[in-house]
């Protein structure tokens, strides 16, 4: 099962466009046009839900095409937008897909994965809601094993208090738990047949459902370990699986966001080379058309409509142009947003301003060793200078260049911090120059190191 980042739901769908942009500004520097476009798209979802009658179903999202080099914030804008609204979010590269009928991933797997994320999100929220009851039931099962089902209420209460206080954490008990060993051999994937691909199915689950029972096995475990196994088991019993699946499908259909990166790589150009490659790229585009326009995809949880899922496509378009995409696909991505290349000022802001800026992250990491890092303004400026220089001379990877530069800059400190006697280190422009100047001036070396 895929893990998803889950938080308690907040009603952020009603945020105004300006409020959405302000939220995005907390984490992302610049790119105001892109922020404005996604803010309007999100607000329109809220507006659509307030429209009454049949007209609501006719209002479809205006999908977005983001144009910009790598590292300028395309993915981060979409990801933060989804996190802001607790929407199911799925990112995939267009180059991962092959045309239906060829070996490889088909585009419908996008929706299957999106629904899987939505199910995991809803399930995690449901488990939070039943956590207290699940813990109570788990403790009762442990007490049954510890003192027996027929023990007096006084005895059970006495041992319950010890379990809750952690006094018996290292006591070994014998307890019956669910047997998660696959029956008949693990999972398999239905072959790629157009319209019939349902995703990964677990053969053991299918047999278990058919027999109408679940296997258990008796294990010897410490009480503290048993709690981590039994609480999830009891949570599963308390939550309504059918209700979760229905809520997840509804969430994916109405609030889902799909981010398709590198869409320029499947655009056909006159310089594309092999004819077979052109046909394959065009085939993937044609497969994407019904998905973006609105269709029904069969998943293991049931049919999912894609009519109201927001699709955000992006690409650098250094070689291909947006007009090289199929005209039909261009029409399904009506909102075009061009993201700006990052300047030196942008790099400085990225280092300092976001709530989770890189400088704050590295300072916090080294701070756990009780070593305080202090960056001077001149050091920040020098780091930004080097990032721009390497991007221009080697390859432009945008803000991602800052990660490689800071890793090299702080490599020795990171290695020695746990044994340092000095508790404060000032990073100034001279320190930056001493650490990085040899690499920056040797561009052949910079290609490999930075």
Curated annotation (Swiss-Prot):
Gene3D superfamilies: 1.10.8.60, P-loop containing nucleotide triphosphate hydrolases (3.40.50.300). GO terms for molecular function: ATP binding; ATP hydrolysis activity; DNA binding; peptidase activity; proteasome-activating activity. InterPro entries: AAA+_ATPase, ATP-dep_Clp_protease_ClpX, ATPase_AAA_core, Clp_ATPase_C, HslU, MCM_dom, P-loop_NTPase. The keyword DNA damage does not apply. One of its GO terms (cellular component) is HslUV protease complex. ATP binds at residues 29, 71-76, 261, 328, 400. GO terms for biological process: protein unfolding; proteolysis involved in protein catabolic process. Keywords: ATP-binding, Chaperone, Cytoplasm, Nucleotide-binding. The keyword Signal does not apply. It is found in: Cytoplasm. Belongs to the ClpX chaperone family. HslU subfamily. A double ring-shaped homohexamer of HslV is capped on each side by a ring-shaped HslU homohexamer. The assembly of the HslU/HslV complex is dependent on binding of ATP. ATPase subunit of a proteasome-like degradation complex; this subunit has chaperone activity. The binding of ATP and its subsequent hydrolysis by HslU are essential for unfolding of protein substrates subsequently hydrolyzed by HslV. HslU recognizes the N-terminal part of its protein substrates and unfolds these before they are guided to HslV for hydrolysis. This is ATP-dependent protease ATPase subunit HslU. The gene is hslU.
């Amino acid at each position: 099962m895929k893990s998803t980042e889950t938080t308690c739901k907040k009603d952020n769908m009603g945020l105004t466009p300006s409020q959405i942009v302000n939220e995005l500004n907390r984490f992302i520097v610049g790119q105001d046009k892109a922020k404005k476009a996604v803010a309007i798209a999100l607000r329109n979802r809220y507006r659509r839900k307030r429209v009454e009658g049949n007209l609501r179903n006719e209002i479809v999202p205006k999908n977005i095409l983001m144009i910009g080099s790598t590292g300028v914030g395309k993915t981060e804008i979409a990801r933060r937008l989804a996190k802001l609204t607790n929407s199911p979010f799925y990112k995939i590269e267009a180059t991962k897909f092959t045309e239906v009928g060829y070996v490889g991933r088909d585009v419908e797997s996008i929706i299957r994965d999106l629904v899987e994320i939505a199910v995991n999100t809803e399930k995690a929220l449901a488990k939070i809601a039943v956590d207290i009851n699940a813990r109570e039931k788990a403790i009762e099962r442990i007490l049954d094993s510890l003192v027996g089902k027929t023990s007096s209420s006084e005895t059970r209460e006495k041992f319950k208090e010890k379990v809750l206080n952690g006094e018996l954490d290292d006591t070994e008990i014998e307890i019956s738990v669910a047997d998660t060993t696959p029956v008949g051999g693990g999972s398999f994937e239905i072959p790629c047949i157009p319209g019939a691909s349902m995703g990964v199915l677990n053969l053991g689950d299918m047999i278990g459902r058919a027999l109408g029972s679940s296997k258990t096995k008796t294990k010897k475990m410490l009480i503290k370990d048993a709690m981590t196994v039994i609480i999830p088991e009891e949570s599963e019993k308390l939550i309504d699986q059918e209700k979760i699946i229905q809520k997840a499908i509804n969430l994916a259909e109405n609030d889902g966001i799909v981010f398709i990166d590198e869409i320029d790589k499947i655009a056909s150009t006159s310089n594309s080379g092999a004819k077979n490659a052109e046909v394959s790229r065009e085939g993937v585009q044609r497969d994407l058309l019904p998905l973006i326009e609105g269709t029904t995809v069969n998943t293991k949880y049931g049919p999912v409509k894609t009519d109201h899922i927001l699709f955000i496509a992006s690409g650098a378009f250094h070689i291909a142009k947006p007009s090289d995409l199929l005209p039909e696909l261009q029409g399904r991505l009506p909102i075009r947003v061009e993201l700006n290349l990052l300047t030196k000022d942008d790099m400085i802001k990225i280092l300092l301003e976001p709530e989770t800026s890189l400088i704050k992250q590295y300072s916090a990491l080294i701070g756990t060793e009780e070593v305080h890092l202090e960056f001077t303004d001149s050091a920040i400026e020098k780091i930004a200078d080097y990032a721009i220089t390497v991007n221009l001379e080697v390859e432009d990877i945008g803000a991602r260049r800052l990660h490689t530069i800071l890793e090299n800059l702080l490599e020795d400190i990171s290695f020695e911090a746990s044994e340092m006697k000095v508790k404060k280190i000032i990073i100034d422009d001279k320190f930056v120059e001493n650490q990085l100047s040899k690499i920056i001036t040797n561009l052949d070396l910079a290609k490999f190191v930075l």
